[in-house]
Amino acid sequence: MKTVLHNGRTLSGLCLGTASMGSEGLSGAPLQKAFAILDTYYEMGGRFLDTANVYGRWGVDHTNASEKCIGLWLSDRGITDMTITSKCCHYLPEAHDTSRVDRDSALADLAESRRSLGMEQIPIYLLHRDNRERDIRYIVDFCVEMVDSGKIGAFGFSNYRLDRVQAAIDYLGADRKRYFAGLSNEWSLAMESAGAYDPPDGMEPVTKPLARYCAEEDILILPFSAVAHGWFDKLIRDGVTIGADGRFVGSASYRPGWMTAENARNYRILQALHKETGCSMTALSAAYLAGKRQPVIPIVSVSRPEQLAEYAAAMELKRTDVGLGTWQID
């Protein structure tokens, strides 16, 4: 698997998302299914997992099941060379309107994350939500404290807007590369080409100005929902086609507002690339983000181990392959 060298870290070019792992239970068939996916990713050379302290709390055990699942797998397989990104400070499922973006919540989540993962130090720890009423300097200060304690390698943000990221970077100053690992917001080819988009539930997109800023400042972006939940492949199942005028014909069952002229163009290109390469349109849309001329590692989740091979094949494509050079990627 291709790797990305960024700020002294060698990271797999495709990050495996684990949000649903363990949510159906931490034993028996659900655990075996998760282990099979993790094993396949590792055997392919994958060394980068994304999780969060909140992942699984909506599941059958109402606990941080994803972190616990990963911890069980790491221990069972004796694996010590996996880079883990986890997250803290998400609101609780039963208290949606109560912010947990504060020092005490961060430290409590960190203690539980380390215990569940079985790690003395979590390589990358992100704040999962923002509270714009909080001074960004307060947030940065307790994140720096966690790094200085040795309990995390570096911190970053998830679901933060440009002004907040910029203020944090300015506040860190010359220490930025030591402390700040990157940003994880929603970003996908389909979303990028959808025009105005306001994600639900306090999530934030990678806007074009934010992407430009991260490129200028060499900030790593770890996009979640990087394949838009398979939006382009879902169009096929919905029977959507392209008319003589180059526009969509039919309706999408998921995110119909994304049916823009630009996404119709993307749909045509992806269909052609799929026929030429055999890669799914979903995998190709992840490769689109990975091909950006800035540090971007898409986070993808799979329900079956064999799906990982499709992503790996798509990631090997170069800009000049199969017409990708004619695709205006940037």
Residue ranges of model-derived segments:
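N-terminal binding-site loop/beta-alpha segment at the start of enzyme catalytic domains
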Residues: 1-82, 148
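Active-site mouth loops of central-metabolism enzymes
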Residues: 20-32, 92-104, 128, 133-134
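Conserved beta-strand positions
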Residues: 16-18, 51, 86, 124-127, ...
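Beta/alpha (TIM)-barrel catalytic core signal, keyed to glycine-rich beta->alpha loops juxtaposed to Asp/Glu
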Residues: 130, 134-330
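A short acidic, helix-capping loop that chelates divalent metal ions and anchors anionic groups
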Residues: 22-25, 55-58, 91-97, 191-196
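Short, acidic/polar
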Residues: 28-41, 100-117, 165-170
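Active-site groove signature of glycoside hydrolases
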Residues: 114-135
